[in-house]
Amino acid sequence: MIQSITSQGLVLYNRNFREDDKLVKIFTEQVGKRMFFVKHAGQSKLAPVIQPLVLARFLLRINDDGLSYIEDYHEVMTFPKINSDLFVMAYATYVAALADASLQDNQQDAPLFAFLQKTLELMEAGLDYQVLTNIFEIQILTRFGISLNFNECVFCHRVGQAFDFSFKYGACLCPEHYHEDKRRCHLNPNIPYLLNQFQAIDFETLETISLKPGIKQELRQFMDQLYEEYVGIHLKSKKFIDSLADWGQLLKEEKK
């Protein structure tokens, strides 16, 4: 079945196909993720809008049994500030790849599309891209079938405690129940507290967010542990972020 639709869409990536053609993966608001064929991409009027992290309203010809086609576009947003900063772009690429990994092709998920779009808009507006990524990661865990409770102790259900996390129980422990898991994570209590807050944050009302570098580093390390334990995906974009830690500081110092 072939149908024509108009939908908001975010380009996830493109890849070469034959000599001058491209296959373009777009996450659309109306019909989920689809692969689109662009013939003679280098000379095509579509060339400016088939680059990664371009958001536009596309006129699309959808083929449920094969490749789909882009017929036209308007209302283009290119996120210039994201694309001008290697570090922000790396994190933006990662959250887009994470959304891609969490959703099957051809499966509509308008709330996820809106969440990803808003995340990129807040990065573009200058909010802390590392913290935005942490919030995106913790909220998208449910798309992978993972539900974690950072609000209460798994044993006594008390709230507002100096919690630690236990992979043994997949939940938090209060100080009175630390002994239940000798291999508990020994987290800074601020980490479970922040993740509990992050699970409830609504990006539509978020105006500012700021955390100290040390806390952000601890969050990053624990999020990596959570994803390794419960999700088990290894995205190239995440590996690139990890590599930035090795040489990224040198680039920042050169800009001073």
From Swiss-Prot:
Disulfide bonds: none
Pfam families referenced in this protein's UniProt entry, alphabetically: RecO_C, RecO_N
SUPFAM superfamilies for this protein: ArfGap/RecO-like zinc finger, Nucleic acid-binding proteins
InterPro entries, A to Z: ARFGAP/RecO, DNA_rep/recomb_RecO_N, NA-bd_OB-fold, RecO, RecO_C
Keyword ATP-binding in annotation: no
Superkingdom to which the source organism belongs: Bacteria
GO biological process, one term: double-strand break repair
GO CC term (a single one): bacterial nucleoid
Alphabetic keyword roster: DNA damage, DNA recombination, DNA repair
Protein family: Belongs to the RecO family.
Functional summary from the UniProt entry: Involved in DNA repair and RecF pathway recombination.
Stated name of the protein: DNA repair protein RecO
